[in-house]
Amino acid sequence: MELIFDTYGLFKHFKQPNGNISDVNAAGFTGALLDLRSACPPRYFMHMTRSRNEAAAEGDIFLPDEPDRIGETVKPFLDACRGFDMQVKGAIAPVIPLDRSNPAMNDYQRALSFASVRCAMEAGCEWCIVPPLFVGIPLEEERIVNIKFYKSFFPILKEFFEKHPDEEFKILLQNQCRDRGGHLVRGILSDADEAVEWLKELNEESGKVLGREVFGFCLNIGHVNICGQDLDEITLVLGDYIDAVVLTDNNGSEDSEMLPFTCASRGAGAVAASADTDWLSVIRGLRNIHYDGPVILAMSDTLRTFPVFIRPQLLSFAKTVADFFVWQLTLEQTIAKYSHVVLFGAGNMCRSFMMDYGEKYKPLFTCDNNQSRWGEEFCGLRIESPQKLMDLPDDTGIFICNEYYTEIREQLESMGVKSSIEYFSDRYPNTLARKRLKGLWKNV
């Protein structure tokens, strides 16, 4: 699974990106998104005249007027990424704010989208996210207008494939929100069935014209949350059409981009806050389709609110959060890579492992530090002494099913256990409702 950091929010107009890219690289990220919102931010379209004058005063290129100069704008960013061996495999075109109503905005978006796709191709990207047109378009005409819009990329794509027949490039559609009097509701392509219909029609046509399918889908988790949708259902419909996932957080009502797990609310009468995003649905939904494509960590609003002096520490923590998601999403792949599996722990987490993966990847046994339980059977497994881990078959993975991960790992390493040690967590189980067992730690 490829982890990509979205640098939007780190710098203005891609100016002096070296220090910021250095921090991103030092945090452990190896891939960056060419987010063209940095070159042409949404605020440009809210106050066009003022933004145009400000850009002129600062010597910046005002891309809505000169979209073909986008390559000049992004060059410092691309040079910095190359300097730090940061891969840039994907891009996203500029977006128009959802509250705009002047249909002339669509002309700007068309020109900027074409320029963005060309820029992404020249930068060596494999795909570019191109949001649909929406400003002032009646609901009944949205599909007709946008199918025509996406087909208009065929000449650019044909030219690219003629020059680079062995390379791949895709245009990714993305689920959107819609502004209704200041409230965000479900927008274009938020319905998974509708998205699949669009993709089938577009790819059928691209197959005829280009000899290959060139359209895919980028699933934005933040938009799913705002629309109040269940990712379990969406992913099953979209399936293999999903070529990228934007991992971000928000409060469920505003289209912000926050670091995952940082948005939480306490409802009336609640004793503790709960996450504003249904992370169980997110993780389970992507696991269900064995998603293994690019994950884009988008946290532009978190980046903007943190002082620059502690940004390196923020980026390091962001990498930890991103790694957690990759671990959760690829849990089954981790289990499957071993010929044999053994568990450490004989409680709720062990039971969770057996409910989710026990039938497909039956462990040899489990073990526990509680001597009084040795020889007991739990969830179809015999509970053994940790000492038995010293004599395991080759290619065995030991999965710690206990929240005291660090202590148990240190215990096993001090014993001289040679097998690989992995972690398991039941925080986001595949199996639905389950009652936790109690009293398993007691001597009986």
List the model feature ranges, each with a label.
Residues 6-10, 35-39, 93-96, 133-135, ...:
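Active-site beta-loop-alpha junctions enriched in small/polar residues
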